[in-house]
Amino acid sequence: MGVAIIIVNHLRQVVTMLHEILPSYTAMPVVLISEGLALKPNHVFIIPEKRDLHIRDGVFRLEPISKPRGWPDVITVFMCSLAKHWKGKIIAVIVSGYDGDGADALCAIQDVGGITIAQKLDSAAHPDMPMSAIETGCIDFILAPEDIARQIIQLADG
């Protein structure tokens, strides 16, 4: 398929475990992002905890978290950086979660030709994030989780 999957999770307790859990579910290498790591196709990249993630010149840049109190906005920070600095295809997906992280960057993703997807509210355990995303008016697809996977494959192949 030739895609990189970047998981930006704003839950601090879970994120450090994802790089240990996900290899059981994918043949792609799963990597915890470090400063200066190059973005490569056919890899899954996981943001480390308590860091903002940026991309510049095809490499990941980590900075101290810019919002240390309340719900972090690490998804918004990364997607804004992606919209500004990435020249390839972008597919941004917002799934179940608290608060509205990511929503403020979706129109920027669309403005550079990216595709945006939100999880269907009735399939989300915590619909705040997909609801905030949908309310922006900058969502191309609203799908159940199993349909999100199929849509990503179709978009990546097309």
Give the positions of each predicted feature:
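Conserved acid/base catalytic micro-environments in cytosolic active-site loops
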Residues: 1-158
